[in-house]
C-alpha cells in the first residue's frame, strides 16, 4: 500500500510541538502496571475451556465439546437441530485433518452443500446469503469473552459466519488463549516474522445482538441468529 504525505504530516506535527522531528531512537514504553497479562495467567487449556463454556451461557451460544473422531457426527447433529437444508463451509486445509472433507461429501448427498470456491468470486456471497448454516474453523479463541477469531482469505470468506441464519465454529483446543491480549500479540508476532496477515481478521462473539435505548435485545439483525461452538480435543 502506498504511503502519501507521511513526512510532510510528521514534520508539521513536530513543528507544532516545538521540537525537531524524531526519526530514530524511539522505543515503545514499558508500563509499570500491565494487568492485561494477569487475567487467566497460567490457566491450562482445560481451564480455559471451562471459562469459555461458562461465558457461552452469557452470550447465548451453544457449547459442545467432542473428540476429533466424533466431530463430523456432532456437526451433523447440530445441523439437524437447526433443521438446515443448505450449508456453506470454508475451504480450510484443516477440513481433511478433522475429517470434515468426507463429512461434507456425505452431507452433499442429502443437503445443498457448498464449499467456498474462490474461482466463482461473489457468487459465494449469494450462496452464503441463502444458506441455513455456515461452518468454519476458529484460528484463535478468546476464553474470557467467548470470541472466535476468523482469518478471512480467498478460501474462507467473511460471509460464511455472517450471512447464514446459523453459524457453527469448530474450535481446535490448541487455539484457546485467555483473552484479546494474547490474540493481538499472536497476530503482531506473525506480522513481524513475515507471515502475511489476511486483509480481514474478524472477532466474532456469539450470535448477532442489538439493543435499542430501552435495552430490548434483538438477535440476528446483523448476523446469525444461532451460534454453536464445538471445541475439539
From Swiss-Prot:
Coiled-coil regions listed: none
Biological processes per GO annotation: lactate metabolic process
Domain of life: Bacteria
Pfam hit, one: LUD_dom
InterPro entries noted in UniProt: FTHF_cligase-like_sf, LUD_dom, LutC, NagB/RpiA_transferase-like
Protein family membership: Belongs to the LutC/YkgG family.
Functional description taken from the UniProt entry: Is involved in L-lactate degradation and allows cells to grow with lactate as the sole carbon source.
UniProt protein name: Lactate utilization protein C
Gene that produces this protein: lutC
